[in-house]
Regions:
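Divalent-metal (often Zn2+) His-rich catalytic cores of metallo-beta-lactamase-fold enzymes
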Residues: 239, 260-317
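Active-site-proximal loop/helix segments of hydrolase catalytic cores
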Residues: 215-272
Length: 364
């Protein structure tokens, strides 16, 4: 009996050694297996609180396809190490869901690790990424940039020993702040010296990529969260990467969006059969319940804004009086404090303005 027990334990050990891990973590990211040879990398925010987009990894017969390259090259390098911990196959394709830099600033890390990599985006998104290469350094170098100002405020609070509300920091908090300030300076230096890499392959509307027998479908939905939002779908596995068409971090990102066009896109997304869905930011989903909630939010905001426009109210009056707080309970898990600040800004200010412009035919 003792021999059988030891044999059983040895078998368990050998099995564990030969099976890929379902979750692998490093200091600021978690890579989770979501299908056979398919992984999602979910990142913590950078220390300047700018979010990294989620990254997808699809392993084919001979090569790997990666979806989005996050905000910082250093984080992308760490992602590459995570990928190399599960496969020795090279990354052949890097695909972008849209042009926003929190999804592609890290491209240089992939180009350096895999010099022959094919970098793919929708045609117009590629042009926007080229613009990133022109204005990015100017934006970051500006003395009043968000990155500079937030670091200056952090350093001032540290020097004063208390925050803007007068709360005095503990010794533990001071040590944590000192570490954060060092990290922030390193990140800022990284951004100041960022090399924006342009896509070297573009497509219009749709593109199918075969990784051996695995089919990967890219579809451009046009205007939604950005001018051109692309989803990546694995029909065999029913796995969808939504990009920022869907974000739960904790609420949708609505700046520079097109709500009138976004709504029908969400309705179409709901029709796609899924077992797993990786959002642009936020937790992994396993059905369309969150898609439905975002669609209901868009429908409600558009309906209420249009009603107020017909009543003759100005944009400022609409922003001051519209109320969609009934929609967030139990969905976005927002604290009462965040409800007064973040939710109010993202929804009442930004989304309402974009909806107002869309309805009036003024873009947005």
């Amino acid at each position: 009996m003792r021999f059988l027990n030891w044999s059983f334990l040895l078998l368990l050990f050998l099995t564990a050694k030969t099976q890929p891990l379902t979750v692998i973590k490093d200091e600021s990211a978690t890579m989770e297996k979501i299908g056979n040879g398919v992984y999602a990398i979910l990142h913590q925010n950078a220390t300047d609180q700018w979010p990294h987009g989620n990254t997808g990894v699809v392993i084919g017969d001979n090569e790997v396809l990666v979806i989005d390259a996050c905000y910082l090259p250093s984080r992308a390098k760490a992602d590459i190490k995570l990928i190399q911990s599960i496969t020795s196959k090279p990354v052949k394709y890097l695909v972008f869901t849209h042009w926003h830099f929190d999804h592609n600033n890290g491209t240089i890390a992939y180009k350096q690790a895999y010099p022959g990599i094919t970098i793919i985006s929708e045609r117009e998104s590629a042009r926007w990424i080229e613009l990133n290469a022109i204005w990015w350094s100017k934006m970051i170098n500006a003395p009043n940039s968000v990155q500079h100002k937030s670091l200056q405020q952090l350093e001032a609070d540290f020097a004063n020993g208390k925050d803007s509300t007068g709360k005095v920091f503990t010794e533990t908090e001071k040590k944590e702040m000192a570490t954060t300030i060092t990290q922030r300076k390193n990140e800022l230096n990284e951004l100041l010296n960022l090399e924006v890499v342009k896509p070297n392959r573009v497509f219009d509307k749709e593109l199918t990529i075969m990784l051996g027998k695995r089919k990967i479908q890219l579809h451009d939905w046009g205007k939604a969260n950005s001018p051109h939002d692309v989803t990546i779908y694995l029909p065999g596995e029913k796995i969808l990467f939504s990009g920022d068409i869907l974000v739960q971090d904790p609420q949708p990102y609505t700046g520079q969006s097109w709500p009138v066009q976004w709504l029908p896109v969400l309705k179409q997304i709901e029709k796609i059969p899924i077992h797993t869905m990786v959002l642009g930011h936020g937790p992994i989903q396993h059905d369309h319940s969150y898609t439905q909630k975002v669609r209901e939010l868009m429908e409600t905001v558009l309906t209420r804004v249009e009603e107020m426009i017909l009543q003759g109210k100005t944009l400022a009056e609409i922003q001051a009086t519209i109320n969609v707080d009934d929609l967030y309970t139990g969905v976005w898990n927002i604290s009462e404090e965040d409800k007064k600040t973040t939710w109010k800004h993202i929804i009442n200010t930004v989304l309402v303005e974009r909806a107002w412009r869309s309805i009036r035919g003024q873009g947005g």
